[in-house]
């Protein structure tokens, strides 16, 4: 039940009305209160809400202790609402990765965690989930402050799912076992499912806590130890979660957390000879680098969850109002900063014009502002680099002669707020239809028939997710099977239950996270063959 409740907050379906987290307050976001609030830097400063949470952990977590980086260096983590410094955190580098890997190796080879009964490991994960719920407001505040996503999204959707994921993996801890295999001859054969060892994990900035759970949960349930590198933009919630894990009774060295930059700390972790497994979520280009570093070191196995350019297909039989709302959610959720965002909206030619007009109207009603305010649907982009990238793609769309229906500009002159932007008359060869923008930019394309849209939807290097909106079950089944994507949502989108596997085809990555399949990422399978002398039953 908990999973279904959380999923309903993160999805849109035929039967649902506008979700509570993202409901419009009926204001025009371009000529109403938002521009008045963000029209000048002074007005923006007056309206900014200061979260009550204290930033108490900014050091690296190594071997059960919060410590400074070996170099003593720090770097700032910034508030996306203003671009101002929230706190300075320890800047880990290769030496700190070495320290963390050494702690994780010792904890795996000599510590109690892998030898602990699976039931006892599950109890630690359950205690951690309880502590997450106890400190949900602090975690949600830090997540929103560091990332810019709406506070209500953090508090009522992401934190409950964060706790749910760890309870899910706690349930798996004592159900991981091998098989007895009938083999020819006088032999008894069974398999052992053993923890893989020291797992290196690199998480992104768009969903810091959820990606923490997707990786840390299965690794711990299987009995591994971990070195986790945070995204440099969003280190704060990982450190807070690390503190809660220590309170829950996780032994020292089992979970080590290093903040730092990809070129230094990330590269050192990916190429480390004493790391047995690597998991990475981020861009496809960086994923290629990570895979190369892993291959050129000790050939450690790598799980990759990478970029996407997901098609969202609206057929002519669709309820247009519901399809517009779902397509809007599929793209604009989390400021458009979702790897699986429905960023290519394909609409049948018979309903195209109506769909475009209603999509424009919905975007104009989207409430953009300080994510700590009630009723806000969209906060700022994560940082200046991402802001400039999105604005570059908007300019490209205009120059490519796509029709700019609305948006396309910055809101205010402080922070990284972008108007919800809708393009129509988009062609497949335009950059806005090919590249992962990772921002609030909806591209609406026209199609004529099923075969055509299947072909066009699959003509991308990505294959992470897709959405299909139709009342026809035959169409839904046909298209779902034909699309080359790791997840296909039919009449819904962004449904993320703890048990549903997630991962990509093609250049969207390999392996699966969440669900039973994620356990395979962190297990070694050993076959044990024993000769039998005069077995009674042969």
Curated annotation (Swiss-Prot):
Reaction equation(s) it catalyzes: an aldehyde + NAD(+) + H2O = a carboxylate + NADH + 2 H(+)
Keyword field: Mitochondrion, NAD, Oxidoreductase, Transit peptide
E.C. number: 1.2.1.3
SUPFAM superfamilies according to UniProt: ALDH-like
Cellular component aspect of the GO annotation: cytosol; mitochondrial matrix; mitochondrion
One Pfam family matching this protein: Aldedh
Major localisation: mitochondrion
Transit peptide location on this chain: 1-38
Cited InterPro entries: Ald_DH/histidinol_DH (IPR016161), Ald_DH_C (IPR016163), Ald_DH_CS_CYS (IPR016160), Ald_DH_CS_GLU (IPR029510), Ald_DH_N (IPR016162), Aldehyde_DH_dom (IPR015590)
GO molecular function terms noted in the UniProt entry: aldehyde dehydrogenase (NAD+) activity; ATP binding
Positions of the record's site feature: Transition state stabilizer: 206
Cellular location(s): Mitochondrion matrix
Functional description taken from the UniProt entry: Possesses activity on acetaldehyde and glycolaldehyde in vitro.
Family per similarity comment: Belongs to the aldehyde dehydrogenase family.
The name this protein goes by in its record: Aldehyde dehydrogenase family 2 member B4, mitochondrial
The organism of origin for this protein: Arabidopsis thaliana (Mouse-ear cress)
Organism lineage string: Eukaryota, Viridiplantae, Streptophyta, Embryophyta, Tracheophyta
Gene name for this UniProt entry: ALDH2B4
